[in-house]
């Protein structure tokens, strides 16, 4: 199988703090077409698109669809930064189609690092999906090709895992800071 590359553009923390110098933003934009999937949070998506941060899912979806179409890269819209009961994630594919994975919003302060965790989980599951897809295809033209269905299944698994992890973390009561 060919490598699967997931880029988590760690540019802006949930607190709003910038983690990447503005001069490096174009370099990160230049990387996007070279990866399979990118997992920006809402403020990072806005920086990549050179727009204001989305306030609604529809605005985030529009930004992601434009970025995906322009780069040929699947963009994951992470619902954790948006309002509403659904904190799910959506894969927006370069052809404009999307696959949403619903998950209820949890009332938790234990969310520091969940974006990185989602990206790592997604990268792992995409590798599993690609391996299973490749084995099922045996030696056909589809061998080694990551499909939108593979990405959707990996996102379902990763979203469920992250939701369960956040829920389980609520009872730990460790540390004293945010997250």
What are the functions of these language-model segments?
Residues 16-18, 86-90, 167-168:
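Short acidic, glycine/serine/threonine-rich loops at helix termini
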Residues 117, 121-132, 161-168:
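Solvent-exposed, amphipathic alpha-helical segments
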Residues 75, 109-111, 171-173:
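Short glycine- and Lys/Arg-enriched binding-loop motifs that mark or flank ligand-binding interfaces
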Residues 99-109, 159-160, 164:
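A structural signal for small-residue-enriched, beta-sheet-centric alpha/beta enzyme cores
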Residues 134-179:
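Charged C-terminal helix
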């Amino acid at each position: 199988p060919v490598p699967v590359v997931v880029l988590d553009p760690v540019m802006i923390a949930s607190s709003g703090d910038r983690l990447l110098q503005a001069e490096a933003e174009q370099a990160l934009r230049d990387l996007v077409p070279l990866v399979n999937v990118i997992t920006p949070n809402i403020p990072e998506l806005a920086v990549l698109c050179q727009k204001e941060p989305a306030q609604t899912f529809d605005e985030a979806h529009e930004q992601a669809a434009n970025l995906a179409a322009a780069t040929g890269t699947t963009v994951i819209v992470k619902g954790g930064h948006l309002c509403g009961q659904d904190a799910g994630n959506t894969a927006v594919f370069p052809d404009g189609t999307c696959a949403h994975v619903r998950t209820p919003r949890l009332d938790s302060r234990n969310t520091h690092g969940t974006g990185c965790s989602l990206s790592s989980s997604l990268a792992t599951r995409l590798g599993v999906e690609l391996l299973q897809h490749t084995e099922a295809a045996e030696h056909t033209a589809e061998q080694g090709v990551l499909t939108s269905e593979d990405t959707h299944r990996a996102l379902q698994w990763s979203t469920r895992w992250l939701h369960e992890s956040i829920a389980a973390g609520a009872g730990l009561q460790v540390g004293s800071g945010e997250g």
